[in-house]
A protein has these predicted regions:
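Primarily single-stranded nucleic-acid-binding OB-fold modules
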Residues: 1-78
Length: 78
């Protein structure tokens, strides 16, 4: 049986932070794979989840690269 595929969630508190959005796309493009990348925008009640059009390979290299731009608490694998 194949395990349920995981999803990578990246939380961006400020939806207007284009620098982080660009960084996210760059990192994702460097780690292509089969898993979905979900971008969570905003805070608390105002959160919006967007499924990114590209898929990634959820590996340590990917999360490490993301941690350079995002707080570790902003990156989750579920």
């Amino acid at each position: 049986s194949t395990p349920m595929s995981q999803k990578l969630f990246v939380h961006l508190k400020d939806p207007n932070d284009s620098e982080k959005l660009i960084a996210l796309k760059k990192v994702a493009s460097e780690h292509p794979g089969q898993e979905e990348l979900i971008l969570v925008l905003g805070e608390a009640a105002q959160k919006t989840a967007l499924r990114m059009p590209f898929k990634v390979a959820i590996k340590d290299e990917l999360t490490t690269a993301l941690h350079e731009f995002f707080d570790p608490t902003a990156v989750a694998i579920k």
